[in-house]
């Protein structure tokens, strides 16, 4: 089927299967990497030294973010189109492997024609196999893979989600921080509920983190009933549930729920169910 066909079905009309591939269509990625998963035209890229269950879990989380209701249709075709046309990739690797890959891309097509936003690091990041509700631990995939997917949202709907001053997302973040701070302030105003203090994180970077936090709260991924993530993050963000988001951050709640956008509403668990309702992991 074509890259932008509405539905993704295999020849039998069943679920979309995420096959582990040994080559990427861009040969420049094949020099140091040898495991790839095509998730609706967006590639998870990895290496055979990484256990396959980690790669497959990340691929399934990506699929769940793109088709959260698992009906086989991209939740937002324009966000999907942006990510595919700009060749975004989701690396699952180690820092040592990363240091081998990037030099191999210099002077090749891949150097300037791939989309990079975030990575999953085997041995450092956390995978919650079976999902956070079952595992009882946080899944770093929920953050890092959303950082990739969200680039499509920033660029497709700049008035609403643009990662710069003036968008609705920026206005909501300014309210959450207690003011418009282009750089991290020495201290946040009393009453602020988004208080990220990484001085290397500029305004757009602060927005990326904020978009992640409000989405996680909105899908109840931070609910203390599941993991300790919200309590562990209270020095940066303490809004744990959709109900709390509505009460504490009404601008974010309205943006996510009342403006007609089809954002994720279910917590990705690493088990994309596709068209048939069967898990692919």
Where are these regions (language model features)?
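Start-of-domain marker
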Residues: 17, 21-30, 39
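Sequence contexts marking disulfide-bonded cysteines in secreted/extracellular proteins
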Residues: 2, 27-29, 109-111, 231
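Generic detection of long, well-ordered alpha-helical segments
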Residues: 48-56, 202, 242-246
């Amino acid at each position: 089927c074509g890259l932008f066909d509405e539905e993704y079905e295999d020849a039998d009309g069943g679920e979309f299967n995420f096959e582990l591939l040994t080559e990427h269509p861009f040969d420049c990625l094949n020099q140091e990497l040898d495991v790839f998963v095509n998730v609706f035209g967006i590639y998870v890229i990895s290496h055979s030294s990484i256990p396959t269950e980690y790669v497959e879990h990340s691929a399934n989380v990506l699929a769940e973010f793109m088709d959260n209701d698992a009906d086989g249709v991209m939740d937002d075709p324009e966000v999907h189109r942006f990510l595919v046309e700009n060749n975004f990739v989701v690396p699952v690797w180690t820092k040592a492997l990363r240091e081998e890959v990037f030099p191999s891309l210099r002077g090749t097509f891949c150097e300037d024609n791939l989309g990079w936003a975030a990575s999953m690091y085997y041995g450092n990041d956390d995978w919650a196999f079976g999902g956070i509700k079952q595992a009882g631990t946080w899944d770093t995939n929920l953050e890092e893979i959303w950082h990739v997917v969200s680039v499509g949202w920033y660029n497709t709907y700049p008035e609403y989600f643009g990662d710069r001053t003036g968008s609705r997302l920026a206005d909501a973040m300014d309210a959450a921080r207690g003011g418009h701070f282009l750089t991290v302030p020495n201290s946040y105003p009393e009453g602020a509920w988004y208080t990220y203090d990484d001085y290397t994180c500029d305004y757009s970077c602060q927005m990326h983190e904020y978009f992640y936090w409000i989405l996680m709260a909105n899908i109840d991924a931070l609910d203390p009933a599941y993991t300790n993530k919200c309590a562990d993050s209270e020095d940066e963000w303490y809004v744990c549930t959709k109900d709390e988001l509505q009460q504490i951050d009404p601008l974010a709640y309205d943006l996510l729920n009342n403006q007609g956008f089809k954002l994720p509403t279910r917590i990705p668990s690493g088990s994309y169910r596709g068209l048939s309702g069967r898990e692919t992991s």
